Amino acid sequence: MSLNPVIFSIGPVSIYWYSLAYVLGIVFAYWYLHKLDDQKIFTKNFYDSLLTATIVGIILGGRLGYVLIYDPVLYISNPIEILKTWEGGMSFHGGAIGVLLAVIISCKRHNIPTFYALDLVSCGVPIGLFLGRIGNFINGELFGRVTTMPWGMVFPESGDNLLHHPSQLYEALFEGLLLFAVANSLFFLTRIRLYHGALTGIAVMWYGIARFFVEFFREPDYQIGYLWLDLTMGQLLSIPMVLLGMLVYLGALNLKFNTKSVT
C-alpha cells in the first residue's frame, strides 16, 4: 500500500495530508468548544489565547516529545531534521502535555475553571487524534506488526514486502472515533459534566488503555524496540496515563475538584 503524502505542490512548497490533519483537528476542536460551552463561560479573549497556546503546545510538545523520547540520537546528530514536522515524528504524549499546559495557562490568565475547560477539550480532541492517525496511515508510518489477517497491508516503509496490521487505523478507531463517542455520550446523556475533571479523567484513562492495547498490534519503533517486560515505549508511557486519569476521575468525584462550580 502506497499513498502519496503530498496533496499538491506549488514550486518548492508542498502541502501534506499529515499537516492538513493537524489543521483540521485544531479547527474542529476550536469550533466544537463554542458549541459545548452553552453557558458562555468562555470569552473571546480566552478562545484567542487558547487557540494560540494550543497550536504552540501541539507543535512544540509533540515534536520535542518525539525527539527526546523516541529518537534523540538521530536528531542530535542532525538537528535540522527537528524542523521537518511535515514528515511525521510527533509524539502524542508530548503533544498532550503541550495542550494541557496551554489550557492551564489560558484558564489562569482569563479566570476560567480549568477542569471545566479540560472536560470540554476532552470532548473535541478525539477528532484531532482520529485525523492525525489517518495522516500517519497516508504517510505509511507507524504501521503494525506482521500478520496473516486478510486486511493486512504492505507498507513500503517496512522494507519487507510482508502484510502488516494497519495499526494506524486501529488507533484512529479506538483512540479517536470511539473516544469521541464515549466522551460526548457521557457529556450529553449523564450528569458527569457537573463534576469538573471527571470527564477529563475518563478520557485520559480511555486513551491510555486503548493505546496500550493497540500497541500489541503496532510495530515498535525500530530504534527502541521492546523494553521492560517486552513492552513498547508507547505502552510504558500509557501506564502512567491510566493511573493519572484514574486519580483525576476519583478526585473529581470525591475531592470536589469543581470548587468553582458552573451550574
UniProtKB/Swiss-Prot annotation:
Annotated metabolic or biological route of this protein: Protein modification; lipoprotein biosynthesis (diacylglyceryl transfer)
Localization in the cell: Cell membrane
Transmembrane segments: 6-26, 50-70, 85-105, 112-132, 169-189, 197-217, 233-253
Any one GO biological process: lipoprotein biosynthetic process
Keyword Transmembrane appears in the UniProt entry: yes
Topological type in the membrane: Multi-pass membrane protein
EC number, as in UniProt: 2.5.1.145
GO cellular component, one term: plasma membrane
Keywords associated with the record: Cell membrane, Membrane, Transferase, Transmembrane, Transmembrane helix
Residues bound to a 1,2-diacyl-sn-glycero-3-phospho-(1'-sn-glycerol): 133
Pfam families reported for this sequence: LGT
GO terms of molecular function: phosphatidylglycerol-prolipoprotein diacylglyceryl transferase activity
Cited NCBIfam families: lgt
Function of the protein: Catalyzes the transfer of the diacylglyceryl group from phosphatidylglycerol to the sulfhydryl group of the N-terminal cysteine of a prolipoprotein, the first step in the formation of mature lipoproteins.
Similarity remark: Belongs to the Lgt family.
Full protein name: Phosphatidylglycerol--prolipoprotein diacylglyceryl transferase
Organism per entry: Wolbachia pipientis wMel
Organism ancestry: Bacteria, Pseudomonadati, Pseudomonadota, Alphaproteobacteria, Rickettsiales
Name of the gene: lgt
